[in-house]
Amino acid sequence: LKPVNVMDQDWVGGGAAGEPATGSSPSLSTRVFDLQAACVHFGHPARAVRALSEVSLQIDAGERVALVGANGCGKSTLLRLLHGLTAPTSGQIHSEAALRQAMLFQKPHLMRLSVQANIALGLWLRGTPWKQAGVQALAALARVGLLALAQRSARQLSGGQQQRVAMARAWALQPQVLLLDEPTASLDPHAKREVESLIEAFASASQAMTLVFASHNLGQVKRLASRVIYLEQGRVLADLPVHDFFSGPLLQQQFPAAHLFVKGELV
């Protein structure tokens, strides 16, 4: 494990550069993330806002981890910390640097280029020859149903279509670690269902992939997650297998705040 590097570009995946994955997948014993008392504060030290407080957790290769909690609880900050876009104010975070990462945000970051070029550029920056990158971009667009729009300007697409382009961009990178920061939060119900279906297809097609995602869709959490982390005011209050998180008695007895959250979200 090596200390994670803070990156300044948040529109493409992190991790190792270059070609699609070959060879064996990482074993389940690989420690992908290791956080020890990680804190993230924003603003002037005298009036700092504590986005994360003393977060300690480990995530291994192949795990499917859902981050849940009310708005402002620290889910997005934790994902950005894992991806290297935010540095800890104190504490430590270690990341398995050899694994390719990709991240999807609530609002996709697309450039004033064609849809195809938005995807191909990320591949090219990682060492894929430009012509090959273009071919791989078209294949990724076909998987999300946008091949016919390959030459359209990405900025002219609807919100749902733009998020599907972001999905295709992540798909093309063939990430071993995928981080999702509520990518359907700003979409209308129809587009939300489309993108959620793509996310579930992506996860199902890549069983060895490590998935960490923030979501208010508890149905999707049940379908995708093997483990649920509940955050409140920047702290981890519950970290349980998905069955235990939704089973009721254990959550209600040991983590009453998380139980009330789940009960409210399911009403």
Model-assigned labels for residue ranges:
Residues 131-149:
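Conserved ABC ATPase "signature" region
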Residues 153-157, 161:
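Conserved ABC ATPase signature
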Residues 235-260:
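Conserved beta-strand-loop-alpha-helix hinge in the C-terminal portion
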Residues 83:
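Helix-to-loop junction immediately C-terminal to a conserved catalytic motif
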Residues 215-216:
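H-loop/switch region of ABC-family ATPase nucleotide-binding domains
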Residues 178-181:
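Catalytic Walker B motif of ABC-type/P-loop ATPase nucleotide-binding domains
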Residues 68-70:
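The feature captures the beta-strand-to-loop junction immediately N-terminal to the Walker
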